[in-house]
Curated annotation (Swiss-Prot):
Protein family per UniProt: Belongs to the universal ribosomal protein uL24 family.
Source organism superkingdom: Eukaryota
Cross-referenced Pfam families: KOW, Ribosomal_L26
Protein name: Large ribosomal subunit protein uL24B
Main location: cytoplasm
Subunit composition and interactions: Component of the large ribosomal subunit (LSU). Mature yeast ribosomes consist of a small (40S) and a large (60S) subunit. The 40S small subunit contains 1 molecule of ribosomal RNA (18S rRNA) and 33 different proteins (encoded by 57 genes). The large 60S subunit contains 3 rRNA molecules (25S, 5.8S and 5S rRNA) and 46 different proteins (encoded by 81 genes).
GO biological process, one term: cytoplasmic translation
Keywords: Cytoplasm, Ribonucleoprotein, Ribosomal protein
Source species: Saccharomyces cerevisiae (strain ATCC 204508 / S288c)
Any GO CC annotation of this UniProt entry: cytosolic large ribosomal subunit
Amino acid sequence: MAKQSLDVSSDRRKARKAYFTAPSSERRVLLSAPLSKELRAQYGIKALPIRRDDEVLVVRGSKKGQEGKISSVYRLKFAVQVDKVTKEKVNGASVPINLHPSKLVITKLHLDKDRKALIQRKGGKLE
């Protein structure tokens, strides 16, 4: 099948360069996670940029099935940390694990006026 738009490059090298050199404002959108089936039905949207205090479920990787609240979003590393998803160091200390938001599902949204405005702007519904 031919390319739909000639304005968009399908060159892998250019796509990777755009991803890894993206400014923080674009990384926010790149760090989006899908909503759970219940939230998707409730709000009428499929995914949202992840933020602190959202509750998530890990759906891929060795920590699959664990739940927790987002404690930090590290845009520079394309990573988020979930407060209950940690690993034990040899000395007994526990350290948070960096996860990519595409491997998470948002189970509870942290709603404030800006988040509500974003949902409405995306064409979603609020209760």
